[in-house]
């Protein structure tokens, strides 16, 4: 059973999400929160698999709440936003969010998003990814700390990181290199450990911030 906390300051959205997710036999909404601070408390108390986190909330905004949830728990955060141009997108990924979902997404997409993020995968819609890459391009120069961390990877781990940033799954990376999927999982696990990553969304950020992958190429 996947355990979910809903964090949104609008009652209507929380009720709608709760109804949709509650209809799934493998998903349980264990708590709701009307602001970021309450979301952090709920995550610490209930230890959910996923926190659906609205980005614009009172008391503590979604970015700050995401940072605290990721630091204090093993829960994964799926950020919610009304617009794919939201200025919070980049900051939330930096804070540890595993992906983004637009609030007007079809109900099937909401259910799938929860399952994908709970499984440890990233959920980055093309429009959202483009926005984040655009922000990285605007920043211009690679992050020296990220460069140093990526330099410490083996050649194979570096290549796997590059392919993760390109959106390939473990199975696709295995086929690309004629490796077993188990071997690829080992490489992914090793590079996650070395780079202190929680999931593939963070791996994508590191690949771009280190200059391993260049926006636009």
Region annotations inferred by a language model:
Residues 26-34, 42, 197:
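Short hydrophobic/Thr-rich beta-strand motif most characteristic of the beta2 strand and flanking loop
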Residues 35-38, 59-64:
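Acidic catalytic/metal-coordinating carboxylates
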Residues 41, 63-74:
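Short amphipathic alpha-helix used as the core "switch/output" element in two-component signaling
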Residues 46-52:
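Active-site beta3 strand of CheY-like receiver
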Residues 89-94, 99, 104-155, 159, ...:
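Short, flexible helix-to-coil linker/hinge segments that flank and couple to helix-turn-helix
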């Amino acid at each position: 059973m996947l355990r979910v906390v809903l964090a949104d300051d609008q009652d209507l959205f929380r009720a709608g999400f709760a109804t949709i997710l509650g209809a799934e036999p493998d998903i349980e909404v264990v708590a709701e929160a009307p602001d970021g601070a309450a979301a952090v408390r709920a995550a610490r108390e209930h230890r959910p698999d996923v926190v659906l986190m609205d980005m614009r909330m009172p008391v503590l905004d979604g970015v700050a709440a995401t940072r605290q949830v990721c630091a204090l728990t093993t829960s994964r955060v799926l950020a919610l936003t009304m617009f794919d141009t939201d200025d919070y997108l980049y900051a939330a990924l930096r804070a540890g969010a595993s992906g983004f979902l637009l609030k007007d997404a079809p109900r099937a997409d909401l259910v799938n998003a929860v399952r994908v993020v709970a499984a440890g995968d990233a959920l980055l819609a093309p429009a959202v990814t483009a926005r984040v890459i655009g922000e990285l391009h605007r920043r211009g120069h690679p992050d020296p700390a990220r460069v140093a961390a990526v330099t410490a990877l083996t050649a194979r781990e570096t290549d796997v990181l590059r392919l993760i940033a390109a959106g390939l799954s473990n199975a696709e990376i295995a086929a690309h290199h004629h490796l077993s999927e188990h071997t690829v999982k080992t490489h992914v696990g090793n590079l996650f450990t070395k780079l202190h990553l929680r999931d593939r969304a963070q791996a994508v950020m590191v690949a771009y911030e280190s200059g391993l992958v260049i926006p636009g190429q």
